[in-house]
Amino acid sequence: EPLIGLLADHKDSLGLDNVIFFKRTPLSDERGKVESLIRKGAKIVSTTDTISEFHQLGFNEASDVEQAYADSDVIIDCTPSGNDNWDNVYSSLDQNKRFMAQGSEHGFGSFFAWGINNEILQEDSNKFLIASCNTHNIASIVKTFALDEERELVEGKFVCLRRANDVSQNDSFSPSPTITKHSNQEFGTHHARDVHELFAQEGKKLNLFSSAIKLPTQYMHTLWFSLTFKDAIQHEAIMNNLNNSEFLMATEKMSSNKVFSFGRDHGYHGRLLSHGVVAEQSL
């Protein structure tokens, strides 16, 4: 819902006529969340067989999602079913619309990462795959420390230390460190593959490899990385790159709970919108 809230809060300045969100299941314990989004100016839709239940919860403005599909110019799918929804729903809609899916839906469309390849939005395509948070993080590190400075990157290695689940979730918590298998012999996990494909769209071929492990924490993903360059590089130069970056932030904090707490207290909807937060003393 932070994305819905952001778009609704700024719809006038963004030139949006309406912000419509789809809620599948009417749950009384989520009434407050829906009320908050409606107060911001967003409109709720659902399937025909659940609209009456939303009306019973007090959301008399709830309407049919099928009409929303017809009326909307841009459809953003934030579910792990984006590819299935394309096959079953979106492919039959007006193809002048723009369709976006989350990072898990590999193959949905061209990779897009904000601040990394904005120019892809100008291409004649109607399907975009929004890169995941880890893909944004890795791509921004590669772009900031290598590509933007025209340094020849020999190799990039990454270990994604992933949170078990989000603080908003009760399910899928991992009680112990759990390793993610290397499903790709060239890239390891999908994280390096996704970043490689993102830059390959621009004709750049990068030697990247990633591993991942899920840890019993709900705070934030953490990334370990090692970049090897052809030529020697000075620590001062790297720090200058970090401090001048628009999308990477620097911090003196050394624990994810401290960074998470700062974002909760000062971030938009309690979120940090930077691609990554780099602990200065770790470089």
Each model region followed by its residue ranges:
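Short glycine/serine/threonine-rich phosphate/pyrophosphate-binding segments
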Residues: 2-5, 82-86, 137-140
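C-terminal substrate-binding/catalytic lobe of Rossmann-fold NAD(P)-dependent oxidoreductases
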Residues: 2-63, 152-155, 159-160, 165-283
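Structural alpha-helical scaffold elements that stabilize or flank donor/cofactor-binding regions
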Residues: 67-69
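Rossmann-fold NAD(P)-binding glycine/threonine-rich loop
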Residues: 81-126
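Rossmann-like dinucleotide-binding core of oxidoreductases
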Residues: 110-182, 186
